[in-house]
Amino acid sequence: MAAPGPALCLFDVDGTLTAPRQKITKEMDDFLQKLRQKIKIGVVGGSDFEKVQEQLGNDVVEKYDYVFPENGLVAYKDGKLLCKQNIQSHLGEALIQDLINYCLSYIAKVKLPKKRGTFIEFRNGMLNVSPIGRSCSQEERIEFYELDKKENIRQKFVADLRKEFAGKGLTFSIGGQISFDVFPDGWDKRYCLRHVENDGYKTIYFFGDKTMPGGNDHEIFTDPRTVGYSVTAPEDTRRICEELFS
């Protein structure tokens, strides 16, 4: 059972509310709207706002009390934009270019069954780096993900970057199936908590699937300000919520 007092449920998107990069199902959408009648709900994802809309609907800011794309670097509350932070003013152009150039030369040397396009996506709060390229098809995405599980392509890439850019104040975080994020230290999903910690919640629940060390849900999952639940799929999220808030 849930703890008494005002509470907020924060959900990761991919693998938690939806299948990776897929749209939310009608059943899950309806379930969350019912849940919202009992408790405040919010989403926090690494993706940009457009991708969150693609997955959760164009009216996402009306359907959730809080929407935090890019780990909360972009923040919406009660349907209105709260704030937007950007990576270039924080890190400076020189470091960003060094990072982009290094990633592109590393990707050029990696042999994969397939490579597509958009290897680096520049977002407000992070760089998203994909060895196969974000424009791959769903089938190619799954093929890469299966290969990555065996060969640790992303893990090796990240280990190399951590060595190369040690001491530069950067965090490298693997999430989803085909990419990893690079952002300033402290700009992980915990960043979104600054937007909610003064809103009077007694408990902030967090649900995510990449909660292991190195996963992009790990920091917020283990943060003392949250009660974390590790899930394997949207069905799992729903089951736990039903147990907590029935």
From Swiss-Prot:
Transmembrane segments: none annotated. SUPFAM superfamilies: HAD-like (SSF56784). GO terms for cellular component: cytosol. Mg(2+) 2 binds at residues 221, 223, 226. Mg(2+) 1 binds at residues 12, 14, 209. It is found in: Cytoplasm. It holds the Pfam family PMM. The keyword Acetylation applies. It is an enzyme of class 5 (isomerase). InterPro entries: HAD-like_sf, HAD-SF_hydro_IIB, HAD_sf, PMM, PMM_cap. GO terms for biological process: GDP-mannose biosynthetic process; mannose metabolic process; protein N-linked glycosylation. Alpha-D-mannose 1-phosphate binds at residues 21, 123, 134, 141, 179, 181. Keywords: Acetylation, Cytoplasm, Isomerase, Magnesium, Metal-binding. Pathway: Nucleotide-sugar biosynthesis; GDP-alpha-D-mannose biosynthesis; alpha-D-mannose 1-phosphate from D-fructose 6-phosphate: step 2/2. Its main location: cytoplasm. Its EC number is 5.4.2.8. The modification N-acetylalanine is found at residue 2. The active site is at 12 (nucleophile), 14 (proton donor/acceptor). The keyword RNA-binding does not apply. One of its GO terms (molecular function) is metal ion binding. The modification N6-acetyllysine is found at residue 149. Involved in the synthesis of the GDP-mannose and dolichol-phosphate-mannose required for a number of critical mannosyl transfer reactions. Belongs to the eukaryotic PMM family. Homodimer. This is Phosphomannomutase 2. It comes from Macaca fascicularis (Crab-eating macaque). The lineage of its organism: Eukaryota, Metazoa, Chordata, Craniata, Vertebrata. The gene is PMM2.
